[in-house]
């Protein structure tokens, strides 16, 4: 059986919002949610919601019950039938990859084919997308430079 391939569609404006949030804190990870829709093989990001009430550490970001409640409340303001299609988070000076904890979040909450995550390393100035496909999380494309200038050497 052929694997279903999805295209990720995210505007430069929304990418800038994601990067600005990820560049705002380099002592701990930050993150948020990607709202949008799945249309004809495309994962279309239409809104970004910064995660609130997280338990953040240098190498880990945890979404608490309050985090999810706040995200769903914000989604209801955007559109009553808004769809959560993914999430984003930073890896300050750790590179672009998914840790075991990140993979857990993706496979538990965003396991449906086409659900996405983007990782941003503000120190190294890199970002990369990952996508759920066939019960796995795989890199969507090669990592690329962020539009904001990296914060470290």
Locations of regions flagged by a protein language model:
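Conserved beta-strand-loop surface patch within small alpha/beta domains used
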Residues: 1-84, 93-153
């Amino acid at each position: 059986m052929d694997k279903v391939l999805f295209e990720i569609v995210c505007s430069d404006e929304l990418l800038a919002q994601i990067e600005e949030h990820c560049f705002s804190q380099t002592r701990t990870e930050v993150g948020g949610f990607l709202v949008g829709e799945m249309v004809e093989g495309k994962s279309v990001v239409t809104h970004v919601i910064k995660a609130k009430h997280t338990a953040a550490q240098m190498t880990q970001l945890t979404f608490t019950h309050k985090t999810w409640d706040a995200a769903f409340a914000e989604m209801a303001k955007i559109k009553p039938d808004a769809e959560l299609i993914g999430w984003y988070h930073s890896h300050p000076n750790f590179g672009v990859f998914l840790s075991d904890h990140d993979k857990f979040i993706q496979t538990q909450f965003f396991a449906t084919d086409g659900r996405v995550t983007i990782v941003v390393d503000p120190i190294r100035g890199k970002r990369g997308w990952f996508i759920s496909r066939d019960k796995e999380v795989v890199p969507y494309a090669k990592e690329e430079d962020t539009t904001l200038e990296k914060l470290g050497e």
